[in-house]
Amino acid sequence: MFRLLHTADWHIGKSLAGYDRTGEWEVFFQRLIKTIEEQSPDLMIVAGDVFDSATPSNVSANMYYNLIETLHTKYPTLKIVITSGNHDSQSYLNAPKEILHYFNVDVVGSVARDDDGICFDKMVIDLGGAIVCAVPYLRRGDVMSMGGEKPSVSEFYQRMLEAAVKVRGERQVPIIGVGHLTTIGAIYNKDINSEITATRDDSVGGLENIDPHEFPDDFAYIALGHIHRRQRAGNRENIWYSGSPIPMSFSEKDYSNSLSIMDFDGRQLSEIHTVELPHVVKLRRVPDKLSDFETVANALQQLPDDEEMFIEVALNPDLRSPEIKTRIINELLKGKKAKFCGFQLVGVAGASILGDDAPMSVEQLQTMDPMTVIADIYQARMHTQLSDRHADMLRTIIDEIAET
């Protein structure tokens, strides 16, 4: 038997409304170590978005490297495969790969190439008991550079599989794929500040909306990242998103976070189970729907004093103001460990806050996150999401304006 631990979308370093969440990652890493101790996996795959930023802080980097050192010290036979996601810097992940190899860690931050094009065989990792096709986050150029009449993501995986089959030979071991992408039918939230910030490009075989049935059948399992909710891809029993280990935004507050454990018998997937990861710090919307100030005040006052939590306040948009925000923080939450993270975000494209067709007022828009407004309007007008490049450019501009 060969056992895999599948995880993804750690987003180390991501804050929430400016609040540091280092403690939550520290607890997650402790739980991860405990799970490895109890489950004894042969391999751990991290399917992209290790970091939340292309330029991680020293604190984030230290947590990452300390974890790798601890895992290698405690479990020297554990193999680890790490691929990049759309939030990761390919070069940053790749830089220490030669050193990390001595810790039984294989990092694939970018598509391998030489003068003749893509080197599919260099992204195939032979672990003895399994073969891994370590596909990083694919960009348009990665797929287009394959050539051919209709280059596609499915064709990319087919070529990876062909390279893996050659490496495997006659051995009765599984071939495991890795990916960081969105599949058709995947359930995810559309908060631009949360999980989906990548381009959707159907001109290249659908860089995002991949039909799960287009993945080659001969993969024993495909470990996916990019969607933060744990779920199966389509009705394919052998293709799963592990989900993220902690909720990244309030739109993910009800997600059930977990680690995925996969067992293989010979070349086939034989069993699937999960290890639940209870939320370290709860994310709560108070109250549970948009309300007037009196209802909000009563709900906030009923929160326990000694329980740490992040809260999003569901106050009707026309009642919001800097004065109300100050009153919430200084009066209603005084003496409580609850941290105010802002007002509930609401859509702006085509419908009002309360569900009718009236346009939103300037005052209502001023209470909202600028990035959410831009992303929502763009998707409504263009029927597609902002590309990651444009989203990053806009974030930079917004941050620069905020600092002036």
Q: Where is each model-derived feature located?
A:
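Accessory, non-catalytic peripheral segments of nucleic-acid enzymes
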Residues: 264-404
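Catalytic-core regions built around general acid/base machinery
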Residues: 63-75, 207-218
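His/Asp/Glu-rich metal-coordinating catalytic cores
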Residues: 56, 87-236
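A conserved active-site cap/scaffold subdomain adjacent to cofactor or substrate pockets
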Residues: 212-216, 220-285, 289
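N-terminal active-site segment of His-dependent metallophosphoesterases
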Residues: 1-69, 76-77, 177, 396-404
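Divalent metal-coordination and catalytic microenvironments
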Residues: 9, 49, 64, 85, ...
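A short helix->loop->beta-strand "cap" motif at the edges of active sites that frequently abuts
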Residues: 73-79, 173, 237
